[in-house]
């Protein structure tokens, strides 16, 4: 025994209570009790008497439930001794005795002195405690209010206690007792306390079950939240406070109450309900003996579910895959789960009861049971939600309870049913997919879809239910993916939205309704709230899935148009331990099964269902076409068996049309009907059961022949399945008809005189092959038919099916719903039946078998697209119509909120069409297009537009245009309200075409022409009513303005003040993300364009806002800003080129402001943002036809330079492009103004140009080059050339670009350029980009028509090259020569044609005089300069010799004497200056070029003797038609040929002279090989000339055609003589000089051949006897002259032969002697030949001959 100190603790509790018991006990009746009490008192007061009983005493060693508050415990015997008087006192039934005993027990439990487990099935200790609890429970039967509270207190303390554990029957007994007190107590406080105690106990039981621990901390419930609205109205606050104190006090008395967080807990007929037997612990068939119909239903449901579970597990058990957990766990394993299961089942059974209406107590019991279930479900934990046992309990018991209560006419019952369903959907939907698919339509949709005659209270409850359902954003999405995308489920989401729409629209006109107007209005408002909630839920879900930031965040959404990596996760129906499933708030998920449902799978499922629905819809109109459609769409197979199976199983098919189709006589229909009937198995079925089963799926057609075919096949099938029932199928056929007639007669209310059994028997006599069927058989058949009507599944249509069929119900479970909810009017007497329960069970089994029973927890946002497709049109109608028709503030607010959520969802999902539909509708409701009609609701719509812009700006995309259009219109009206003049007054001054600009300053804008007199002057322009046009800022005018409308407008303008400042839309644009700001800018530009293009009222509001938003967003990252400016750039270009001068000026001034702001930002090197920013100036400068605009641009750019020059970097490029464009302008002022600025830039800011990249310097040079072509003032051109020279000097000094600076840049001597190799300019891109534009620009000026400009340009060009060329590398020189110097001669090398006197040059040089001037002055000078430059830098550029020579050759080749002469002169000049430095290879190049020039300039007279000319002449002789024209044309051609030939002949003479000069200068430097090449060139010239001279036909033609040759002299005789003479000289000198490479034999051979050739030419002419009869001049005279001309050459040849050595002469004498002999006999034109011949004979030939004779 424990110490005395400790004993006193127990004694302080027990002894006072026992004293009271003794005091209040009757000594007669309770003497034994008193004696026990005294004994215990003495035992507790006397320590020596309270020592443990001897070990020999029974039970002394067994611990008991009592302990002393410390470590020591009382034995079981001692515990029994102490507790026995308390138990006995509590059982006396005397209030005064019972009260202290119960109070003592409560204190013992509260203080933890009682420990152990109370369970009647346990050991001695458990039995003792069980008896103690049982005794307390029975005390409430005394019917005392105070004792009731004490009992409740004790029981709640017992359940709450951690030391005392209540399980099994004891727990149920406690619940039963509290339940009984709630129903039986007459005290309201006691009732409330009993209810609160039940809730607290239930919460404790389930919380412990979830934690799997009895020590889990529990918070007291909040009593006020348990009170239903009805209870709250009937109770006063003191009751609630009293009950709350009662609960809290008890909870505080238990140890560990406050260990948990301060979370606020809102956890807020009976014998059969509290049975502890579980499925499998008793024979289920024994339960069918119950006489309580409700309990019979419950047991039947339980048995059916249990059997189904066993059947479903047989296969698993056979495979050994099922763990032995659930049943055993509940029965003997986890007692906490078992307790929770028992309590839950008990509450379900209590809620199933259908008490008589005259028994309100039992109805209250039903209600409180439902309330408890509601609380438990609302606060269900993970174990409850996912355990198979509990899910099975829900399916077994709770579903039956919902089924029974769903049609109750008591609103509280219906409300609780809805609340329970809400909990199931919210938290258990993953495990109850099939059940929710049934109960949601049954409880919610049937009420929602009944629009005309609903029960108002039920409808309001359903609407509030849907509103609560939308709180969890995951629920609607899960409903859609699991039902609307499931072929075998009803379109719950679609039906819900459509039902809400119909409710929101109200009862259709002309429809009879039971609703009062206030009721209908309240219902419409609540429906609209639900629609808003649906959209809000969808928006919340997509926000959560995509983790969208707040509306003002700049974070970019990049995953809207693609699927998330997580797909939709299928969850097995009711399996698993819970999973994430892609969402957070909903706790209804179960363990995710394998496999993901991605966006494609969702889309395919949805598309499949929609197509199937379409096919069923077609079938319900035309069955044959429907079947054809379904077969073609692969929804149904084409075999009769597959079609029959579809007709039998598919939901939504019209039963009448099925019957019609089956009765058709066509081949396919007939085969389908046979397959349909053959699919039934009638074995062992009664005849009427077979007919019932057969006719359940369709309605017999009205046509007799169709019925006959169907019933004939039925009879055949029945007899085949039951061959012994009838003798033939005829019997079954006739009996089937008879049964159908009996069914109609018995159940048709129109038939007054019913058929009797005898009548039925009589009608069927002799049908069995002449024999009668047994009378008993027929009578039983009659009874069954009369008692139970044969009907189809959808007999007794509910209100919703009386409406036209639509796709939303085609695949739903409406057939079940119509059984559950019959026609209105039967609701009051409605009772569930065995038939109903059985039917529901079949449907659940069917759903469980289908693969679609897999539950999908949606996480892929693609599903929202399909949801929007379903609901956007109803939503738009639901919000638009009330907003248009009603001015109520509440309705307006709701509609606008709905618009906002709809636009959010469609925008985030990038559903452009749907988004634009909502946005345009909302914009229309602003009424800004018709301001006279503006009301308060329109003002609210404007506010909604502003809110939309602020919160959804990141996702609006193209819809920004509609919003900004509204903003524009609003601001227009707002200004009118303030009396400000419209923007049109800014654009009032007339357009000018003169070159005089009205601008005084670059930042000026047109002044207002006249002051506005007030708002009325301008209001009329805004008054013209029009329809909303989302693409413009002006409506379409339709009516004139009345005075009343004007007054309305003035008053409405004041309403606009409520909206506030619209500018925040623009100021907050910097919070838009990178893509949204671009969409925003595009839309603003479009709206601005519409404003400015308005012919009557142009405005600049949006244009000013463009400037603002560009300013606000200028600090964005460069990449984003570039995209923004790309849009703005195109906009400013378009506006800047506007025909309205004022608008264009305003645009350019706005652009100037932006540019000034942009130039405040520093730009890093190698970036191009400034240049891009200023490009609009460039484009407008080029495109604009307005002088004022171009001048404004010049002034704007000038201002930028003057004020921001330090920050200008890449912007120089655009600036110089503008000035370059201005240089070509047709207006003098523009040119002068721009050059003035360029001059200032170069003089004052040149270092700013050169410090940037190389291209800037290049642009500057190009600009100066453009000014050198100025046609207005020669001084500008000269100054520009001077600036180019300055630029060249700076470039050479290394001031242009850091990378161009040479090392060292300056030499110590006066800054002269150093000449080190390191100072060479390389052929880098930078050097090319720098030097080439400058040099090329100067070279281009060589073609300027002004001689002075040409000279100065060439001088500057060559001075620059001469002064700085020593720093050029060879490669750079090569590029300079090719691209700069040679380009000077490109034109003349190609296009100069001396034969065309009136040719027009492509560069603008008109007439031959200008061409000749250029040739004689500029070309010659340029060639000299080129030669001089080459000579000066020969050491560097000598590898370019060949290219220079080719330049000369190309000039020589041109058929122009002056040009060729210049080329030849340059060649000679080059040879004279640097020839002495040439190597053999270089001389070879020179000689080769000379030979090429000689060959290319050969005269050609072949055309004169060609066949074409001869044909032309003969044709002229034959006809005189057009002879004059032909003659002129021929003469022109001949003149051109002859002129060309003469020109080439002259050029060849120049070539011979040049060769002679070069030979004379470098005779001793040339090798034999060089000389022979020159010889070949000269000999070729001579040979060609002789050939022409010897062509007598040619000479005669030239004479005959009137050639300019007036004599018979050979046309090219001089050329021939000079060329042969030169050849002779070369050969003679070669023999005498004998240079390097000399070959005597070769040279002598050439010389002998040349001499012989000359002599032969002379002899041929001198001795010729042929004379042409066509010669006009006597031949003798011409011959004489020719011989005279040839004489010197012949003399030279004779002398050369004579000077040969004797041996050489003797060697060649055989060849020469005949020529010498012939020459003696010839006629000579000069005595010189004879003299030379005589000398040769005397000095050379004579001695040779004499010696040979000797």
From Swiss-Prot:
Gene3D superfamilies reported for this sequence: 1.10.220.20, Arf Nucleotide-binding Site Opener,domain 2
Annotated catalytic residues: 703
Subcellular location: Cytoplasm, Cytosol; Membrane
Keywords, in A-Z order: Acetylation, Cytoplasm, Guanine-nucleotide releasing factor, Membrane, Phosphoprotein, Protein transport, Transport
Mutant phenotype after disruption: Abnormal nuclear numbers and positions. No embryo sac.
Record comment: activity regulation: Inhibited by brefeldin A.
Main function: Activates the ARF proteins by exchanging bound GDP for free GTP. Plays a role in vesicular protein sorting. Involved both in the nuclear division phase and in the nuclear fusion phase.
Protein name: Brefeldin A-inhibited guanine nucleotide-exchange protein 3
Record organism: Arabidopsis thaliana
Gene name in the database record: BIG3
């Amino acid at each position: 025994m424990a110490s005395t100190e400790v004993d006193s603790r127990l004694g302080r509790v027990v002894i006072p209570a026992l004293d009271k018991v003794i005091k209040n006990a009757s000594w007669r009746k309770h003497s034994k009790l008193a004696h026990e009490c005294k004994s215990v008192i003495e035992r507790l007061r006397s320590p020596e008497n309270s020592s443990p009983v001897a070990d020999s005493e029974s039970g002394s060693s067994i611990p008991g439930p009592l302990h002393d508050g410390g470590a020591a415990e009382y034995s079981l015997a001692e515990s029994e001794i102490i507790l026995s008087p308390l138990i006995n006192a509590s059982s006396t039934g005397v209030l005064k005795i019972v009260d202290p005993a119960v109070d003592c027990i409560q204190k013992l439990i509260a203080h933890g002195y009682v420990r152990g487990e109370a369970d009647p099935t346990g050991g001695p200790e458990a039995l003792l405690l069980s008896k103690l609890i049982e005794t307390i429970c029975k005390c409430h039967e005394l019917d005392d209010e105070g004792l009731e509270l004490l009992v409740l207190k004790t029981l709640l303390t017992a359940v709450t206690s951690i030391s005392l554990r209540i399980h099994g029957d004891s727990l149920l007994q406690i619940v039963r007792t509290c339940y009984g007190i709630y129903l039986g107590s007459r005290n309201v406080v006691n009732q409330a306390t009993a209810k609160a105690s039940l809730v607290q106990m239930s919460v404790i039981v389930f919380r412990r079950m979830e934690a799997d621990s009895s020590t889990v901390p529990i918070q007291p419930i909040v009593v006020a939240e348990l009170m239903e609205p009805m209870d709250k109205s009937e109770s006063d606050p003191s009751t609630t406070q009293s009950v709350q104190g009662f609960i809290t006090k008890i909870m505080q008395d238990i140890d560990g109450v406050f260990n948990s967080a301060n979370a606020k807990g809102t956890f807020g007929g009976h014998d059969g309900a509290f049975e502890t037997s579980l499925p499998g612990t008793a024979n289920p068939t024994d339960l069918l003996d119950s006489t309580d119909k409700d309990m019979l239903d419950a047991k039947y449901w339980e048995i059916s579910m249990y059997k189904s579970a066993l059947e479903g597990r047989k296969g698993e058990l056979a495979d050994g895959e099922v763990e032995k957990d659930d049943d055993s766990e509940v029965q003997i394993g986890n007692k906490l789960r078992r307790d929770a299961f028992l309590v839950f089942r008990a509450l379900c059974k209590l809620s199933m009861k259908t008490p008589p209406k005259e028994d309100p107590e039992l109805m209250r019991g039903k209600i409180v049971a439902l309330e408890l279930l509601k609380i438990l479900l609302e606060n269900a934990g993970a174990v409850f939600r996912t355990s198979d046992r509990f899910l099975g309990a829900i399916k077994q018991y709770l579903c039956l309870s919902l089924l029974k209560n769903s049609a109750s006419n008591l609103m509280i019952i219906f409300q609780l049913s809805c609340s329970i369903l809400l909990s199931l959907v919210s938290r258990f939907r993953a495990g109850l997919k099939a059940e929710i698919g049934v109960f949601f339509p049954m409880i919610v949709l049937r009420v929602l879809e009944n629009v005309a005659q609903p029960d108002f209270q039920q409808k309001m409850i359903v609407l509030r239910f849907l509103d609560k359902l939308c709180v969890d954003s995951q629920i609607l999405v899960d409903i859609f993916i699991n039902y609307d995308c499931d072929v075998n489920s009803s379109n719950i989401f679609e039906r819900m939205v459509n039902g809400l729409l119909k409710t929101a629209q109200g009862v259709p006109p002309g429809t009879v309704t039971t609703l009062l107007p206030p009721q209908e209005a309240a219902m419409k408002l609540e429906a609209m709230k639900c629609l808003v909630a649906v959209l809000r839920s969808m928006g919340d879900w997509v926000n959560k899935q995509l983790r969208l930031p707040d509306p003002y965040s700049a974070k970019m959404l990049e995953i809207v148009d693609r699927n998330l990596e997580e797909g939709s996760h299928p969850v097995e129906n009711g399996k698993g331990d819970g999973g994430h499933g892609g969402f957070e708030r909903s706790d209804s998920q179960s363990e995710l099964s394998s496999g993901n449902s991605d966006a494609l799978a969702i889309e395919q499922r949805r598309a499949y269902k929609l197509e199937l629905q379409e096919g069923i819809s077609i079938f319900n109109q035309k069955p044959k076409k429907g079947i054809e459609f379904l077969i073609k769409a692969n929804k149904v197979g084409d075999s009769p068996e597959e079609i029959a199976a579809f007709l039998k199983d598919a939901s939504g098919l019209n039963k009448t049309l099925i019957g019609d189709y089956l009765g058709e006589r066509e081949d396919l229909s007939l085969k389908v009907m046979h397959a349909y009937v053959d699919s039934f198995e009638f074995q062992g079925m009664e005849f009427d059961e077979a007919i019932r089963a057969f006719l359940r799926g369709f309605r017999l057609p009205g046509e007799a022949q169709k019925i006959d075919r169907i019933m004939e096949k039925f009879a055949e099938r029945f007899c085949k399945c039951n061959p012994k029932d009838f003798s033939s199928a005829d019997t079954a056929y006739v009996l089937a008809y008879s049964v159908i007639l009996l069914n109609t007669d018995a159940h048709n209310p129109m038939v007054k005189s019913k058929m009797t059994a005898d009548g039925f028997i009589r009608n069927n006599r002799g049908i069995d092959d002449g024999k009668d069927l047994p009378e008993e058989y027929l009578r039983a058949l009659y009874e069954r038919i009369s008692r139970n009507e044969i009907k189809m599944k959808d007999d007794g249509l509910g209100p919703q099916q009386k409406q036209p069929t639509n796709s939303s119900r085609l695949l739903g479970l409406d057939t079940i719903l119509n059984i559950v909810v019959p026609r209105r009017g039967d609701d009051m007497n409605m009772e569930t039946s065995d038939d109903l329960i059985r039917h529901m069970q079949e449907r659940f089994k069917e759903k469980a078998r289908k693969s679609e029973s897999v539950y999908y927890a949606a996480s892929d946002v693609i599903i929202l697209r399909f949801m929007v497709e379903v609901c956007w049109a109803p939503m738009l109608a639901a919000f638009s119509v009330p907003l248009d028709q009603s001015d109520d503030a509440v309705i307006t607010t709701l509609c606008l909120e709905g618009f906002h959520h709809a636009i959010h969802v469609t925008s985030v999902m990038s559903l452009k069409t749907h988004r634009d539909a909502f946005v345009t509708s909302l914009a229309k409701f602003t009424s800004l297009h018709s301001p006279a009609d503006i009301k308060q609701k329109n003002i609210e719509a404007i506010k909604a537009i502003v809110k939309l812009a602020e919160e959804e700006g990141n996702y609006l995309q193209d819809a920004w245009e509609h919003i900004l259009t509204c903003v524009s219109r609003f601001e227009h009206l707002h200004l009118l309200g303030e009396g400000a003049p419209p923007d049109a007054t800014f654009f009032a001054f007339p357009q000018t075409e003169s070159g005089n600009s009205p601008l005084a300053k670059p930042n000026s804008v047109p002044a207002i022409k006249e002051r506005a007199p007030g708002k009325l002057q301008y209001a009329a322009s805004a008054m013209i009513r029009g329809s909303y046009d989302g693409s413009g800022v002006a409506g379409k005018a339709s009516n004139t303005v009345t005075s009343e409308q004007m007054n309305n407008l003035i008053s409405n303008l004041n309403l606009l003040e409520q909206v506030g400042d619209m500018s925040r839309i623009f100021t907050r644009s910097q919070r838009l993300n990178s893509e949204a700001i671009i969409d925003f800018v595009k839309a603003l530009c479009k709206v601005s364009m519409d404003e400015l293009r308005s012919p009557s009222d142009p405005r600049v509001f949006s244009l000013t806002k463009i400037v603002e938003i560009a300013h606000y967003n200028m600090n964005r990252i460069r990449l984003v800003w570039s995209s923004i400016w790309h849009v703005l750039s195109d906009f400013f270009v378009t506006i800047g080129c506007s025909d309205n001068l004022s608008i264009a000026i305003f645009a350019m001034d706005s652009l100037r402001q932006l540019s000034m702001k942009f130039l405040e930002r520093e730009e890093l090197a190698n970036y191009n943002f400034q240049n891009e920013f200023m490009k609009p100036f460039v484009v407008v400068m080029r495109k604009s036809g307005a002088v004022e605009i171009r001048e404004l641009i010049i002034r704007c750019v000038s201002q930028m330079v003057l004020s921001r020059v330090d920050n200008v970097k890449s912007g120089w490029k655009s600036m110089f492009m503008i000035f370059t464009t201005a240089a070509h302008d047709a207006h003098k002022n523009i040119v002068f103004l721009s050059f003035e600025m360029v001059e200032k830039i170069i003089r004052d800011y040149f270092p700013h140009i050169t410090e940037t990249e190389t291209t800037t310097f290049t642009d500057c040079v190009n600009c100066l080059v453009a000014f050198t072509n100025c046609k207005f003032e020669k001084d500008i051109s000269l100054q520009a050339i001077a600036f180019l020279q300055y630029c060249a000097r700076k470039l050479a000094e290394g001031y242009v670009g850091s990378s161009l600076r040479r090392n060292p840049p300056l030499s110590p001597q006066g800054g002269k350029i150093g000449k080190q190799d390191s100072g060479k300019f390389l052929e880098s891109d930078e050097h090319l980009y720098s030097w080439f534009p400058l040099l090329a620009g100067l070279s281009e000026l060589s073609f300027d028509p002004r001689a002075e400009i040409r000279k100065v340009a060439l001088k500057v060009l060559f001075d620059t090259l001469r002064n700085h060329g020593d720093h050029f590398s060879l490669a750079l020189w090569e590029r300079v020569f090719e691209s700069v110097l040679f380009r000077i001669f490109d034109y003349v090398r190609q296009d100069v044609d001396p034969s065309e006197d009136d040719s027009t040059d492509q560069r603008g040089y008109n007439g031959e005089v200008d061409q000749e001037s250029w040739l004689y002055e500029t070309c010659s000078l340029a060639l000299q300069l080129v030669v001089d430059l080459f000579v000066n830098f020969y050491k560097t550029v000598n590898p370019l010799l060949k290219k220079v020579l080719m330049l000369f050759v190309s000039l020589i080749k041109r058929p122009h004497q002056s040009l060729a002469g210049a080329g030849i002169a340059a060649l000679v000049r080059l040879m004279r200056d640097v020839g002495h430095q040439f190597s053999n290879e270089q001389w070879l190049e020179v000689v080769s070029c000379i030979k090429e020039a000689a060959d290319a300039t050969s005269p050609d007279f072949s055309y004169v003797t060609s066949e074409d000319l001869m044909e032309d002449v003969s044709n002229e002789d034959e006809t005189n038609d057009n002879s004059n024209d032909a003659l002129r044309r021929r003469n022109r051609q001949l003149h051109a040929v002859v002129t060309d030939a003469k020109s080439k002949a002259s050029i060849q003479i120049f070539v011979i002279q040049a060769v002679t000069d070069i030979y004379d200068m470098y005779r001793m430097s040339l090798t034999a090989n060089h000389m022979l090449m020159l010889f070949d060139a000269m000999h070729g010239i001579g040979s060609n000339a002789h050939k022409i001279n010897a062509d007598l036909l040619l000479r005669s033609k030239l004479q005959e055609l009137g050639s300019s040759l007036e004599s018979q002299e050979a046309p090219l005789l001089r050329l021939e003589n000079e060329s042969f003479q030169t050849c002779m000289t070369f050969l003679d000198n070669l023999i005498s000089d004998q240079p390097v490479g000399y070959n005597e034999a070769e040279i002598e051979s050439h010389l002998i051949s040349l001499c012989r050739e000359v002599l032969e030419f002379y002899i041929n002419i001198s001795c010729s006897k042929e004379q042409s009869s066509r010669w006009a001049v006597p031949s003798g005279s011409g011959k004489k002259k020719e011989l005279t001309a040839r004489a010197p050459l012949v003399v030279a040849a004779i002398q050369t032969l004579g000077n040969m050595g004797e041996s050489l002469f003797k060697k060649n004498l055989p060849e020469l002697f005949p020529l010498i002999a012939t020459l003696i006999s010839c006629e000579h034109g000069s005595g010189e030949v004879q003299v030379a011949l005589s000398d040769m004979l005397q000095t050379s030939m004579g001695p040779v001959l004499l010696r040979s004779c000797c």
